[in-house]
Amino acid sequence: MSTLETWPQVIINTYGTPPVELVSGKGATVTDDQGNVYIDLLAGIAVNALGHAHPAIIEAVTNQIGQLGHVSNLFASRPVVEVAEELIKRFSLDDATLAAQTRVFFCNSGAEANEAAFKIARLTGRSRILAAVHGFHGRTMGSLALTGQPDKREAFLPMPSGVEFYPYGDTDYLRKMVETNPTDVAAIFLEPIQGETGVVPAPEGFLKAVRELCDEYGILMITDEVQTGVGRTGDFFAHQHDGVVPDVVTMAKGLGGGLPIGACLATGRAAELMTPGKHGTTFGGNPVACAAAKAVLSVVDDAFCAEVARKGELFKELLAKVDGVVDVRGRGLMLGVVLERDVAKQAVLDGFKHGVILNAPADNIIRLTPPLVITDEEIADAVKAIAETIA
């Protein structure tokens, strides 16, 4: 039996049976078991930041697995320290005081990073956590409690208590929620760009307003950069576009370039709330995953991020000329293509015929999160293919 025939007989039915079997990849392209080549505009859902089979990752992972594969956090290893140092440097933007106050907790995924942030919020002793309507923070119970999408939560009620939802981007509404009892609000969670709901950027000034509100009432500002981080939007962290410094940042996806790794960065008092016994992880900080992350970070520097921003503008410019496209949202290489008709789901299926891998978070929206190494030529070819899928 083929892989696709065997799949539903052995895999729990969380995603259905995939339409194709992928067997290899290089850069921003992947190849299926029939030899068909596709431009990958999804990158494992914003995971393969450096594309497929990047030589820096291959070398780093191969060398590390040959030395030390796993040790647990009962012992120290050099790769985890080096990645933590680099993340703190990127977060602090070389502010020595901020860097000295920042610490990192490593885990295996975005959901786990958000679980850690949830615990940090709880450790403030305050009971209310405010999260955004339509936000997405993961599928584990804690991260799901923070997710403002009732259809994903309904089957698993009751949720962990204390989470309330505000309309994303509505500063006045959020302030009213806080001021009903400000001393009981532990944290405000937000994504700088909501990804799963169709790539919706926060309105201009919203992150700054949240930062000011948090400062006013001693509330933790927690930004979920699981999808937006590691250069995806043209800045290393998307919140840096708005010139704010959160108390806690969660990240994963692109950090390992394809290997599972997540991180929760906390600064100031938020970094001091976790103490021995309060949290833990078996696999978090795995030397091999950290070696991959170190390789990714060695490539994703300021010049690389500037190129991501430029490529994003090229994508927008070309997509704006496509019949049936009414808007292109997002920044860098995290884009939501808003269609005139509800054909996005069909476009995903038709994309295979035209040599592109697409994703549709809504009936009229195509989400593009390609490898950050995609070339201008591949972008042009991809836009032509998208035009054909929605024609």
Curated annotation (Swiss-Prot):
Q: Which reaction does it catalyse?
A: N(2)-acetyl-L-ornithine + 2-oxoglutarate = N-acetyl-L-glutamate 5-semialdehyde + L-glutamate
Co-factor binding comment: Binds 1 pyridoxal phosphate per subunit.
**Could you tell me which pathway this protein works in?**
Amino-acid biosynthesis; L-arginine biosynthesis; N(2)-acetyl-L-ornithine from L-glutamate: step 4/4
Q: What positions are modified (N6-(pyridoxal phosphate)lysine)?
A: K253
Tell me which residues bind pyridoxal 5'-phosphate: G110, A111, F136, D224, E225, V226, Q227, T282
Q: Which cofactor does it need?
A: pyridoxal 5'-phosphate
A cellular-component GO term for this protein:
cytoplasm
Per its UniProt entry, what is the enzyme's top EC class, as one word? Answer: transferase
Can you tell me which residues bind N(2)-acetyl-L-ornithine?
R139, T281
Q: What is the similarity comment for this entry?
A: Belongs to the class-III pyridoxal-phosphate-dependent aminotransferase family. ArgD subfamily.
- Write down the HAMAP family for this protein, in alphabetical order: ArgD_aminotrans_3 (MF_01107)
Quaternary structure note: Homodimer.
Q: What protein name applies here?
A: Acetylornithine aminotransferase
